[in-house]
Protein backbone atom coordinates (compact mmCIF):
# COMPACT_ATOMS: atom_id res chain seq x y z
CA UNK A 1 0.00 0.00 0.00
CA UNK A 2 1.25 3.49 -0.78
CA UNK A 3 0.19 7.08 -0.11
CA UNK A 4 0.77 10.72 -0.97
CA UNK A 5 1.03 13.10 1.98
CA UNK A 6 -0.17 16.64 1.20
CA UNK A 7 0.55 19.65 3.42
CA UNK A 8 2.78 17.17 5.22
CA UNK A 9 4.25 19.40 7.92
CA UNK A 10 6.79 17.58 10.06
CA UNK A 11 5.26 14.21 9.19
CA UNK A 12 3.14 13.24 12.18
CA UNK A 13 0.33 11.88 10.03
CA UNK A 14 2.79 10.16 7.73
CA UNK A 15 4.61 8.55 10.66
CA UNK A 16 1.49 6.64 11.65
CA UNK A 17 1.01 5.26 8.14
CA UNK A 18 4.68 4.33 7.77
CA UNK A 19 4.46 2.33 11.00
CA UNK A 20 1.61 0.32 9.51
CA UNK A 21 3.66 -0.54 6.44
CA UNK A 22 2.45 2.07 3.94
CA UNK A 23 5.06 3.35 1.46
CA UNK A 24 5.40 7.07 0.89
CA UNK A 25 5.07 8.11 -2.74
CA UNK A 26 5.63 11.75 -1.85
CA UNK A 27 5.43 14.30 0.94
CA UNK A 28 4.45 17.75 -0.33
CA UNK A 29 5.19 20.62 2.04
CA UNK A 30 5.98 24.32 1.59
CA UNK A 31 8.01 24.93 4.78
CA UNK A 32 11.71 24.29 4.26
CA UNK A 33 12.41 23.39 7.89
CA UNK A 34 9.59 20.85 7.95
CA UNK A 35 10.93 19.40 4.69
CA UNK A 36 14.35 18.92 6.23
CA UNK A 37 12.66 17.17 9.15
CA UNK A 38 10.86 14.88 6.69
CA UNK A 39 14.11 14.10 4.88
CA UNK A 40 15.94 13.37 8.12
CA UNK A 41 13.12 11.06 9.20
CA UNK A 42 13.22 9.29 5.82
CA UNK A 43 16.95 8.72 6.37
CA UNK A 44 16.23 7.25 9.80
CA UNK A 45 13.67 4.86 8.36
CA UNK A 46 15.95 3.74 5.54
CA UNK A 47 18.97 3.22 7.80
CA UNK A 48 16.84 1.39 10.37
CA UNK A 49 15.49 -0.98 7.71
CA UNK A 50 18.98 -1.67 6.35
CA UNK A 51 20.76 -2.27 9.64
CA UNK A 52 22.77 0.95 9.47
CA UNK A 53 21.07 2.93 12.22
CA UNK A 54 24.42 3.77 13.80
CA UNK A 55 24.96 6.37 11.08
CA UNK A 56 21.79 8.16 12.12
CA UNK A 57 22.88 8.31 15.74
CA UNK A 58 26.25 9.66 14.63
CA UNK A 59 24.34 12.53 13.10
CA UNK A 60 22.37 13.13 16.29
CA UNK A 61 25.61 13.16 18.28
CA UNK A 62 27.03 15.83 16.00
CA UNK A 63 29.63 13.51 14.46
CA UNK A 64 28.16 13.84 10.98
CA UNK A 65 26.66 16.77 9.08
CA UNK A 66 23.16 16.70 7.65
CA UNK A 67 24.64 16.69 4.16
CA UNK A 68 26.75 13.64 5.02
CA UNK A 69 23.70 11.88 6.45
CA UNK A 70 21.69 12.50 3.29
CA UNK A 71 24.62 11.35 1.15
CA UNK A 72 24.63 8.00 2.96
CA UNK A 73 21.21 6.99 1.62
CA UNK A 74 19.99 6.61 -1.99
CA UNK A 75 18.81 9.89 -3.52
CA UNK A 76 15.28 8.58 -3.95
CA UNK A 77 14.91 8.36 -0.15
CA UNK A 78 15.05 12.12 0.30
CA UNK A 79 13.55 12.90 -3.11
CA UNK A 80 10.18 11.75 -1.78
CA UNK A 81 10.03 15.17 -0.08
CA UNK A 82 8.78 17.92 -2.40
CA UNK A 83 9.44 21.38 -0.96
CA UNK A 84 6.84 23.38 -2.90
CA UNK A 85 3.77 25.38 -1.96
CA UNK A 86 0.69 23.77 -3.50
CA UNK A 87 -0.97 26.33 -5.75
CA UNK A 88 -2.53 26.56 -9.22
CA UNK A 89 0.86 27.70 -10.52
CA UNK A 90 2.88 24.81 -9.05
CA UNK A 91 0.52 21.86 -9.14
CA UNK A 92 1.43 20.63 -12.63
CA UNK A 93 5.10 20.50 -11.68
CA UNK A 94 4.23 18.60 -8.50
CA UNK A 95 2.24 16.09 -10.55
CA UNK A 96 5.23 15.61 -12.86
CA UNK A 97 7.55 14.91 -9.93
CA UNK A 98 5.12 12.42 -8.38
CA UNK A 99 4.56 10.72 -11.74
CA UNK A 100 8.30 10.16 -12.11
CA UNK A 101 8.45 8.62 -8.66
CA UNK A 102 5.59 6.28 -9.46
CA UNK A 103 7.35 5.20 -12.67
CA UNK A 104 10.46 4.36 -10.64
CA UNK A 105 8.45 1.90 -8.52
CA UNK A 106 6.90 -0.80 -10.73
CA UNK A 107 5.62 -2.56 -7.60
CA UNK A 108 3.05 0.24 -7.26
CA UNK A 109 1.53 -0.67 -10.64
CA UNK A 110 1.08 2.98 -11.52
CA UNK A 111 -1.51 3.37 -8.77
CA UNK A 112 -1.86 5.50 -5.63
CA UNK A 113 -3.81 3.73 -2.89
CA UNK A 114 -4.29 6.60 -0.49
CA UNK A 115 -3.96 10.36 -0.14
CA UNK A 116 -3.61 11.89 3.33
CA UNK A 117 -3.17 15.39 4.71
CA UNK A 118 -4.91 18.55 5.76
CA UNK A 119 -4.53 22.11 4.46
CA UNK A 120 -3.35 24.80 6.90
CA UNK A 121 -6.17 25.72 9.22
CA UNK A 122 -5.22 29.13 10.66
CA UNK A 123 -8.09 31.01 9.07
CA UNK A 124 -10.83 28.98 10.73
CA UNK A 125 -8.98 27.61 13.75
CA UNK A 126 -10.71 28.45 17.01
CA UNK A 127 -7.35 29.53 18.36
CA UNK A 128 -6.83 31.78 15.35
CA UNK A 129 -10.22 33.39 15.70
CA UNK A 130 -9.65 33.95 19.41
CA UNK A 131 -6.32 35.63 18.70
CA UNK A 132 -7.89 37.78 15.98
CA UNK A 133 -10.67 38.82 18.32
CA UNK A 134 -8.21 39.72 21.05
CA UNK A 135 -6.39 42.07 18.68
CA UNK A 136 -9.29 43.48 16.73
CA UNK A 137 -12.62 41.69 16.19
CA UNK A 138 -14.10 38.36 15.20
CA UNK A 139 -13.88 37.36 11.57
CA UNK A 140 -17.17 37.55 9.74
CA UNK A 141 -18.45 34.42 7.97
CA UNK A 142 -17.78 36.14 4.66
CA UNK A 143 -14.16 36.85 5.60
CA UNK A 144 -13.66 33.25 6.65
CA UNK A 145 -15.06 31.93 3.39
CA UNK A 146 -13.07 34.40 1.29
CA UNK A 147 -9.69 33.77 2.96
CA UNK A 148 -7.56 32.18 0.19
CA UNK A 149 -6.21 29.58 2.61
CA UNK A 150 -9.72 28.22 2.94
CA UNK A 151 -9.77 27.09 -0.67
CA UNK A 152 -6.71 24.88 -0.39
CA UNK A 153 -9.10 21.94 -0.14
CA UNK A 154 -9.66 22.45 -3.87
CA UNK A 155 -5.94 21.85 -4.39
CA UNK A 156 -6.32 18.67 -2.35
CA UNK A 157 -9.17 17.68 -4.65
CA UNK A 158 -6.98 18.21 -7.70
CA UNK A 159 -4.81 15.36 -6.40
CA UNK A 160 -7.87 13.18 -5.89
CA UNK A 161 -8.98 13.86 -9.46
CA UNK A 162 -5.50 13.16 -10.84
CA UNK A 163 -4.64 9.96 -8.94
CA UNK A 164 -8.04 8.44 -8.03
CA UNK A 165 -6.89 6.85 -4.78
CA UNK A 166 -9.05 4.14 -3.24
CA UNK A 167 -9.38 6.19 -0.06
CA UNK A 168 -8.30 9.51 1.40
CA UNK A 169 -7.87 11.05 4.84
CA UNK A 170 -8.46 14.79 5.31
CA UNK A 171 -7.51 16.21 8.71
CA UNK A 172 -8.36 19.57 10.24
CA UNK A 173 -9.36 21.45 13.39
CA UNK A 174 -12.88 21.38 14.89
CA UNK A 175 -13.34 25.01 13.83
CA UNK A 176 -13.73 23.83 10.26
CA UNK A 177 -17.26 22.63 11.12
CA UNK A 178 -18.53 26.10 11.99
CA UNK A 179 -16.46 28.31 9.67
CA UNK A 180 -18.77 30.52 7.64
CA UNK A 181 -21.75 29.23 9.66
CA UNK A 182 -21.05 25.73 8.39
CA UNK A 183 -21.08 26.71 4.72
CA UNK A 184 -17.39 25.99 4.26
CA UNK A 185 -17.57 22.42 5.56
CA UNK A 186 -20.69 21.71 3.52
CA UNK A 187 -18.88 22.86 0.39
CA UNK A 188 -15.91 20.60 1.13
CA UNK A 189 -18.08 17.49 1.44
CA UNK A 190 -20.00 18.36 -1.73
CA UNK A 191 -16.75 18.79 -3.61
CA UNK A 192 -15.49 15.39 -2.48
CA UNK A 193 -18.75 13.75 -3.54
CA UNK A 194 -18.62 15.27 -7.02
CA UNK A 195 -15.33 13.39 -7.45
CA UNK A 196 -17.04 10.06 -6.84
CA UNK A 197 -16.29 9.61 -3.15
CA UNK A 198 -18.49 8.79 -0.21
CA UNK A 199 -17.35 10.73 2.85
CA UNK A 200 -17.86 10.63 6.58
CA UNK A 201 -16.27 12.66 9.34
CA UNK A 202 -15.74 12.21 13.04
CA UNK A 203 -14.25 14.35 15.76
CA UNK A 204 -11.44 12.31 17.28
CA UNK A 205 -9.66 13.10 20.54
CA UNK A 206 -6.04 11.97 20.49
CA UNK A 207 -6.28 11.09 24.17
CA UNK A 208 -8.40 8.06 23.23
CA UNK A 209 -5.54 6.55 21.22
CA UNK A 210 -2.60 6.65 23.60
CA UNK A 211 -1.66 10.32 23.32
CA UNK A 212 -1.37 11.98 26.74
CA UNK A 213 -3.02 15.15 25.46
CA UNK A 214 -6.56 16.35 24.84
CA UNK A 215 -6.33 17.19 21.15
CA UNK A 216 -9.50 17.10 19.09
CA UNK A 217 -9.36 16.94 15.32
CA UNK A 218 -11.89 16.47 12.54
CA UNK A 219 -10.94 13.46 10.44
CA UNK A 220 -12.77 13.11 7.12
CA UNK A 221 -12.35 9.75 5.41
CA UNK A 222 -13.47 9.23 1.84
CA UNK A 223 -13.67 6.12 -0.32
CA UNK A 224 -14.62 5.47 -3.92
CA UNK A 225 -18.39 5.16 -4.18
CA UNK A 226 -18.38 1.79 -5.93
CA UNK A 227 -16.07 0.20 -3.35
CA UNK A 228 -16.91 -1.64 -0.13
CA UNK A 229 -14.80 0.67 2.01
CA UNK A 230 -16.15 2.59 4.97
CA UNK A 231 -15.01 4.80 7.83
CA UNK A 232 -12.34 2.81 9.66
CA UNK A 233 -13.07 1.30 13.03
CA UNK A 234 -10.62 2.81 15.49
CA UNK A 235 -9.71 0.91 18.62
CA UNK A 236 -9.50 3.13 21.69
CA UNK A 237 -6.65 2.51 24.11
CA UNK A 238 -7.46 2.36 27.81
CA UNK A 239 -4.64 3.10 30.23
CA UNK A 240 -3.86 4.53 33.64
CA UNK A 241 -0.83 6.59 32.65
CA UNK A 242 -0.30 10.23 33.53
CA UNK A 243 1.55 12.99 31.71
CA UNK A 244 4.38 12.68 34.21
CA UNK A 245 5.15 9.30 32.64
CA UNK A 246 6.63 11.13 29.65
CA UNK A 247 8.45 13.77 31.70
CA UNK A 248 9.99 12.20 34.76
CA UNK A 249 12.81 10.21 33.12
CA UNK A 250 14.32 13.29 31.49
CA UNK A 251 17.15 15.27 33.12
CA UNK A 252 15.90 18.13 35.26
CA UNK A 253 16.81 21.50 33.80
CA UNK A 254 17.05 25.06 34.99
CA UNK A 255 16.09 27.76 32.50
CA UNK A 256 18.74 28.07 29.81
CA UNK A 257 20.26 24.70 30.65
CA UNK A 258 20.93 21.92 28.13
CA UNK A 259 20.22 18.27 28.93
CA UNK A 260 21.21 16.55 25.70
CA UNK A 261 23.44 13.50 25.46
CA UNK A 262 23.22 9.81 26.12
CA UNK A 263 22.15 9.63 29.75
CA UNK A 264 18.79 10.16 31.37
CA UNK A 265 18.27 10.44 35.07
CA UNK A 266 15.20 8.22 35.30
CA UNK A 267 13.99 4.78 34.33
CA UNK A 268 11.84 4.12 31.30
CA UNK A 269 8.20 4.29 32.32
CA UNK A 270 5.84 1.58 31.04
CA UNK A 271 4.25 4.25 28.82
CA UNK A 272 7.53 5.07 27.10
CA UNK A 273 8.11 1.38 26.47
CA UNK A 274 4.59 0.45 25.34
CA UNK A 275 4.37 3.23 22.77
CA UNK A 276 8.04 3.17 21.75
CA UNK A 277 8.62 6.79 22.70
CA UNK A 278 12.05 5.98 24.11
CA UNK A 279 14.15 3.04 22.99
CA UNK A 280 17.30 1.57 24.49
CA UNK A 281 20.23 3.30 22.84
CA UNK A 282 18.33 6.45 21.85
CA UNK A 283 20.28 9.69 21.83
CA UNK A 284 18.56 12.44 23.78
CA UNK A 285 18.30 15.59 21.66
CA UNK A 286 16.50 18.92 21.76
CA UNK A 287 16.12 18.88 25.54
CA UNK A 288 17.20 22.47 26.04
CA UNK A 289 15.31 24.84 28.31
CA UNK A 290 14.52 28.38 27.26
CA UNK A 291 16.00 31.19 29.33
CA UNK A 292 13.34 32.65 31.64
CA UNK A 293 12.95 36.00 33.35
CA UNK A 294 12.99 35.80 37.14
CA UNK A 295 9.52 37.40 37.22
CA UNK A 296 8.17 34.69 34.93
CA UNK A 297 9.65 31.95 37.12
CA UNK A 298 7.96 33.48 40.16
CA UNK A 299 4.67 33.43 38.24
CA UNK A 300 5.30 29.83 37.19
CA UNK A 301 5.83 28.73 40.80
CA UNK A 302 2.57 30.34 41.88
CA UNK A 303 0.76 28.63 39.02
CA UNK A 304 2.30 25.26 39.89
CA UNK A 305 1.42 25.61 43.59
CA UNK A 306 -2.19 26.46 42.73
CA UNK A 307 -2.45 23.39 40.52
CA UNK A 308 -0.77 21.09 43.02
CA UNK A 309 -2.99 22.38 45.82
CA UNK A 310 -6.43 21.81 44.31
CA UNK A 311 -6.08 21.51 40.52
CA UNK A 312 -6.83 25.20 40.06
CA UNK A 313 -5.76 27.10 36.96
CA UNK A 314 -4.59 30.37 38.46
CA UNK A 315 -5.73 33.37 36.42
CA UNK A 316 -3.52 36.29 35.50
CA UNK A 317 -5.83 38.61 37.45
CA UNK A 318 -5.11 36.60 40.60
CA UNK A 319 -1.40 37.41 40.53
CA UNK A 320 0.07 40.02 42.88
CA UNK A 321 0.32 43.46 41.30
CA UNK A 322 4.11 43.26 41.49
CA UNK A 323 4.10 40.38 38.98
CA UNK A 324 1.70 41.90 36.47
CA UNK A 325 3.11 43.62 33.42
CA UNK A 326 -0.06 44.01 31.30
CA UNK A 327 -2.46 46.87 31.98
CA UNK A 328 -5.26 45.17 30.02
CA UNK A 329 -5.66 41.86 31.86
CA UNK A 330 -8.84 40.59 30.19
CA UNK A 331 -7.05 39.19 27.15
CA UNK A 332 -4.30 37.64 29.25
CA UNK A 333 -6.43 35.80 31.81
CA UNK A 334 -5.19 32.40 30.59
CA UNK A 335 -1.76 33.45 29.37
CA UNK A 336 -0.07 31.09 31.82
CA UNK A 337 -0.98 27.43 32.10
CA UNK A 338 0.52 24.32 33.65
CA UNK A 339 1.12 21.07 31.82
CA UNK A 340 -1.12 18.85 33.96
CA UNK A 341 1.46 16.27 34.97
CA UNK A 342 -0.75 14.20 37.27
CA UNK A 343 -3.60 13.92 34.76
CA UNK A 344 -4.10 11.30 32.01
CA UNK A 345 -3.96 14.05 29.37
CA UNK A 346 -2.81 17.65 29.29
CA UNK A 347 -4.29 20.56 27.37
CA UNK A 348 -3.82 20.94 23.62
CA UNK A 349 -0.38 21.63 22.20
CA UNK A 350 -0.46 24.59 19.82
CA UNK A 351 2.10 26.25 17.56
CA UNK A 352 2.09 29.39 19.72
CA UNK A 353 4.58 27.58 21.92
CA UNK A 354 7.14 28.74 19.35
CA UNK A 355 6.62 32.35 20.54
CA UNK A 356 6.76 31.73 24.28
CA UNK A 357 6.26 28.86 26.67
CA UNK A 358 3.93 30.47 29.20
CA UNK A 359 1.04 28.23 28.17
CA UNK A 360 3.13 25.09 28.71
CA UNK A 361 4.79 25.34 32.11
CA UNK A 362 6.58 22.23 33.36
CA UNK A 363 4.71 20.83 36.39
CA UNK A 364 7.87 20.31 38.48
CA UNK A 365 8.18 23.34 40.76
CA UNK A 366 11.89 22.69 41.26
CA UNK A 367 12.42 23.40 37.56
CA UNK A 368 9.93 26.28 37.12
CA UNK A 369 10.38 26.66 33.38
CA UNK A 370 8.54 26.15 30.12
CA UNK A 371 8.81 22.75 28.46
CA UNK A 372 11.55 21.82 26.00
CA UNK A 373 11.21 20.76 22.39
CA UNK A 374 11.71 17.12 23.40
CA UNK A 375 9.03 17.32 26.08
CA UNK A 376 6.61 18.94 23.61
CA UNK A 377 7.39 16.21 21.07
CA UNK A 378 6.66 13.51 23.65
CA UNK A 379 3.35 15.14 24.55
CA UNK A 380 2.50 14.87 20.85
CA UNK A 381 3.64 11.18 20.96
CA UNK A 382 6.70 11.65 18.75
CA UNK A 383 9.48 9.19 19.64
CA UNK A 384 12.83 10.43 20.92
CA UNK A 385 14.52 9.36 17.69
CA UNK A 386 12.38 11.87 15.75
CA UNK A 387 14.56 14.90 15.11
CA UNK A 388 13.08 18.29 14.19
CA UNK A 389 15.25 20.42 11.94
CA UNK A 390 15.58 24.19 11.81
CA UNK A 391 16.27 25.28 15.39
CA UNK A 392 14.11 25.59 18.48
CA UNK A 393 11.47 28.01 17.19
CA UNK A 394 11.00 26.04 13.98
CA UNK A 395 10.83 22.77 15.93
CA UNK A 396 8.14 24.09 18.29
CA UNK A 397 6.09 25.30 15.31
CA UNK A 398 6.34 21.93 13.58
CA UNK A 399 5.37 20.05 16.73
CA UNK A 400 2.47 22.35 17.58
CA UNK A 401 0.98 21.95 14.10
CA UNK A 402 1.46 18.19 13.87
CA UNK A 403 -0.95 15.28 13.97
CA UNK A 404 0.12 13.02 16.86
CA UNK A 405 1.70 9.87 15.38
CA UNK A 406 -0.29 7.60 17.71
CA UNK A 407 -3.58 9.04 16.45
CA UNK A 408 -2.33 8.71 12.88
CA UNK A 409 -1.34 5.11 13.50
CA UNK A 410 -4.81 4.26 14.82
CA UNK A 411 -6.33 5.66 11.62
CA UNK A 412 -3.77 3.86 9.45
CA UNK A 413 -4.41 0.56 11.22
CA UNK A 414 -8.14 0.81 10.55
CA UNK A 415 -7.62 1.64 6.88
CA UNK A 416 -5.01 -1.07 6.39
CA UNK A 417 -7.45 -3.65 7.72
CA UNK A 418 -9.89 -2.75 4.93
CA UNK A 419 -7.23 -3.07 2.25
CA UNK A 420 -6.18 -6.45 3.64
CA UNK A 421 -9.75 -7.71 3.65
CA UNK A 422 -9.92 -6.97 -0.09
CA UNK A 423 -6.91 -9.16 -0.89
Regions found by a protein language model. Give the residues of each.
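Short alpha-helical segments and helix-capping/turn motifs at coil-helix boundaries
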Residues: 94-105, 203-207, 331-335
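Class I S-adenosyl-L-methionine
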Residues: 105-108, 126-323
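Short, acidic Gly/Pro/Ser/Thr-rich loop/turn segments
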Residues: 122-126, 227-228, 255, 354-359, ...
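Core alpha/beta nucleotide-donor-binding catalytic domains of modification enzymes
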Residues: 2, 8-164, 174-178, 183
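C-terminal target-recognition/interaction regions appended to catalytic cores
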Residues: 271-423
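Short Gly/aromatic-enriched secondary-structure transition segments
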Residues: 41-42, 52, 236-237, 364-367
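Conserved small-residue
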Residues: 9, 38, 115-118, 156, ...
Amino acid sequence: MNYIDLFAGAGGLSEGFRRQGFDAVAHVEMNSNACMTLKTRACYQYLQEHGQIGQYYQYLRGLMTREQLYANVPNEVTESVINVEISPETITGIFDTIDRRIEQHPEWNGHVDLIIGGPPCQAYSMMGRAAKSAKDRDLTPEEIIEDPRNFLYKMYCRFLRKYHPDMFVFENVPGILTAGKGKYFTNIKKYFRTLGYEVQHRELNSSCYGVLQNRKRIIIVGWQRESNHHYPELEAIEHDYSVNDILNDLPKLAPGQVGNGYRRTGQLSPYLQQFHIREIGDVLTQHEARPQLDRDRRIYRKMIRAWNSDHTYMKYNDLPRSLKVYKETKNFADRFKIVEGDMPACHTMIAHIAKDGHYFIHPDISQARSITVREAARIQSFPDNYYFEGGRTAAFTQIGNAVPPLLAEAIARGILQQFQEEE
